[in-house]
């Protein structure tokens, strides 16, 4: 059985090398379970030079008192702790799927109180938990801060970058492995980055052509299930072959994305316009405010005042029309719009009008 699999994989590699398609599976889909897992924890940073949380920050003082109690140091009732050299922080990290116990990873430190700077601080031992509440790593170490803040006695201050946050390179040690279906599942599921029925069908067909009929099955527009080898030792080679299979994805939907704030317009290459004529005029409205001094007569009882005299001009520029014949493509649209000297705002208006007229065969999305 193993010999048959090896021969099939060699044949698959040969076929992959002789075919030229648009995309590899690894570029348009991800293996279910192979992901980054977010970890978070609450901790204390000590060793700050008077830039920590201000005295009276209750959650910082309570956390500091609890930590001292756990270390066997009892705080007399009613005693308030000075927390100027201490800051309460949130610690975050990203744990990859295949990282193991004992390995280290970087962590980000962010102040949650009113600390001015974490420069020179040390994070005390902090557990990092996942979404399931389990502790997956422990973090501790000296913080690297890229920002700096300085203030004078008169209240003036200068801040460069963000001194209230920092990083600890290799500052967390992994204490537990993330459960991963790659090790125990009878099948492997690939999730498409952009769900599409045609792409899912073509992907499963490409896998079946190279790995054998019935190996892969598209279950919906976003997922393709592939039968996995029972032996774990064969799965790495198997996935290595799968993710390098190349095929031509389905054509995406015709879309036009408009950013109304910035005037950015993105048009996909398969946008088609039906026969239409476009005429777009520009109205230029200018309002000029001229200051006027009102000076009363010498013996009058009035007073000198400054007023504004407004002048409003409305000018309509000569508008030009252009015709979009049936089957017009992206290139023709851009050429026609540029020919009349349209601004980004004009382009948005023209595209919206074309869709309202039923001449635009695309989905118009305004963000």
UniProtKB/Swiss-Prot annotation:
Major site of localization recorded for this protein: periplasm
Keyword Cell inner membrane: no
Family matches, as InterPro entries: Flag_FlgI
GO CC terms in record: bacterial-type flagellum basal body, distal rod, P ring; outer membrane-bounded periplasmic space
Signal peptide (from-to): 1-22
Highest rank taxon of the organism: Bacteria
Keyword Signal assigned: yes
Subcellular location, record wording: Periplasm; Bacterial flagellum basal body
GO MF: structural molecule activity
Gene Ontology BP term (one): bacterial-type flagellum-dependent cell motility
Keywords, in A-Z order: Bacterial flagellum, Periplasm, Signal
Described purpose of this protein according to its UniProt entry: Assembles around the rod to form the L-ring and probably protects the motor/basal body from shearing forces during rotation.
Family classification: Belongs to the FlgI family.
Subunit composition and interactions: The basal body constitutes a major portion of the flagellar organelle and consists of four rings (L,P,S, and M) mounted on a central rod.
UniProt protein name: Flagellar P-ring protein
Source organism: Legionella pneumophila (strain Paris)
